[in-house]
Regions:
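Feature activates predominantly on carbohydrate-active enzymes
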Residues: 1-142, 146-160, 178, 182, ...
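Acidic, contiguous N-terminal accessory segments
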Residues: 1-26, 153, 190-197, 201-205, ...
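Hydrophobic faces of well-ordered beta-strands that scaffold small-molecule active sites
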Residues: 31-35, 62-64, 115-119, 161-163, ...
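Active-site beta-loop-alpha junctions enriched in small/polar residues
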Residues: 33, 38, 67-71, 120-124, ...
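Active-site neighborhood of glycoside hydrolase catalytic domains
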Residues: 130-206, 211-215
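Predominantly extracellular/luminal regions of secreted and cell-surface proteins
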Residues: 352-361
């Protein structure tokens, strides 16, 4: 249906389709994005707008990270104290009603998008602990959590419930197996972060890889989100690698590799939701992921390439130029008046020289300041220079040594 909508043309008050034959299918079955509303509340109107816009590019999953240390953002009628302002440490009193959640599920379905609600457990749960004065892994905590899962499963007419399980010390070995079984008995499939609880095939329905340490397991479908975080506050930090990299280093999805979800983690507080979109360069990054997850293929993986462009005499560079031109067209015509800070970078060229030794003297000058050359002779040693393309020039990427810098 999204392909048909993409082909639809409008003339005056009429809509029409051109006569054509299309052979097209997705390389990966999951192509999504995640919002961390547990840390920072985002209005329902903004969420719907983003889902609507991105669904036009065949993004088919919205991952809704609803709970965090800072707040429990989903209304509970059985435990309304969870939503009390005094139990939220950021944006107190802001949460989504159960009816709003149901409406968003219906909104997503109309756009062929699957909503995945996440209730993070047993970690990232300080709001829960503050409310009930007990850990989720305690007997009391599990009793409360099961009642909350009854409410969540009844509210969300969706196939999956995400239970987190990341970044936590497990003190109750029965907690995760018992919660997975309980939610499955409600007719839901269960997703869990990896690294997190260790599962064998059949013990979980899907994992989501959040760290470079995350590994897909045979018999358990995996979502690759390992380097798909975009909260780096630099519009050029991620896009080239997102576009070029193969998803989990695979050309196509299979039984064990389901696809990818790009994540905005609101660790830093931004009160303006448009600022969240702009500073994370959401739309441009999502178009890169949308194309790669639909078409498949790519070149290498994030950890073996920089965020710079390939040389301009390569087919990879030519493909990115084509993508960039189409993306900038959509910036003007589809995302009109939306925060879309990306600008053309295929015309950005640098000449980078090897480092000259200043021996701590910041006032010292060197030959490149006077003349641009391919190499320089300085105090009997030759220093080379090279041409680099693109705006993602890093001495050290925000991922640290996991991603090569421009000299890598």
């Amino acid at each position: 249906m999204q392909t048909i909508q993409q082909l639809t043309c409008k003339s005056n008050e009429y809509h029409f389709l051109p006569t054509c034959e299309i052979i097209d299918w997705p390389a990966f079955r999951i192509r999504g994005f995640m919002h961390d509303v547990g840390r920072t509340y985002i209005s329902m109107a903004e969420l719907k707008k983003e889902i609507d816009l991105l669904s036009k590019f065949k993004i088919n999953v919205f991952h809704w990270h609803l709970t965090e240390n800072q707040a429990w953002r989903l209304e509970s009628k059985i435990y309304p104290e969870l939503n009390a302002p005094e139990n939220m440490s950021r944006m107190p009193g802001k949460y989504y009603t159960l009816q709003e959640a149901k409406d968003l599920v219906a909104f997503c379905k109309q756009r062929h998008v699957t909503l995945i609600p996440e209730i993070d457990m047993p970690g990232h749960s300080e709001a829960f602990v503050k409310t009930f004065q007990t850990d989720m892994q305690s007997e009391k905590g599990m009793t409360i959590l099961k009642q909350l899962m009854d409410e969540v499963c009844e509210t969300f007419d969706t196939p999956y419930i995400h239970i987190g399980t990341d970044e936590v010390q497990f003190i109750n070995p029965q907690f995760v197996p018992e919660m997975v079984t309980y939610i499955r008995q409600k007719g839901k499939k269960v997703i869990s972060w990896n690294p997190g609880w260790q599962y064998q095939a059949g013990e979980i329905d899907m994992t989501q890889l959040w760290s470079y340490r995350g590994k897909a397991q045979s018999g358990i479908p995996a979502i690759d989100s390992r380097y798909h975080y975009i909260n780096h506050f630099d519009i050029f930090a991620d896009l080239v690698a997102l576009y070029n990299s193969r998803i989990y280093n695979q050309d196509m999805g299979n039984e064990d590799i389901a696809g990818s979800i790009l994540a905005i983690w609101n660790d830093r507080y931004l009160s303006d939701e448009k600022q969240i979109v702009a500073e994370n360069n959401l739309y441009a990054n999502m178009l890169a992921l949308a194309e790669r997850s639909w078409k498949g293929g790519g070149y290498g993986y994030f950890d073996d390439q920089t965020n710079l462009l390939w040389k301009n005499d390569t087919g990879i560079y030519t493909q990115f130029v084509d993508f960039e031109n189409r993306m900038l067209w959509h910036k003007e015509h589809t995302f009109t008046n939306e925060p879309f800070p990306y600008v053309k970078q295929t015309n950005v060229v640098w000449r980078i020289t090897e480092a000259f030794p200043n021996e701590g003297d910041l006032t010292r000058s060197f030959p490149p300041e006077k003349e641009e050359k391919e190499s320089y002779l300085y105090k009997g040693k030759t220093y080379q220079s090279r041409i680099i393309y693109g705006a993602g020039l890093y001495l050290r990427h925000v991922w640290g040594d996991l991603i090569p810098g421009f000299a890598g």
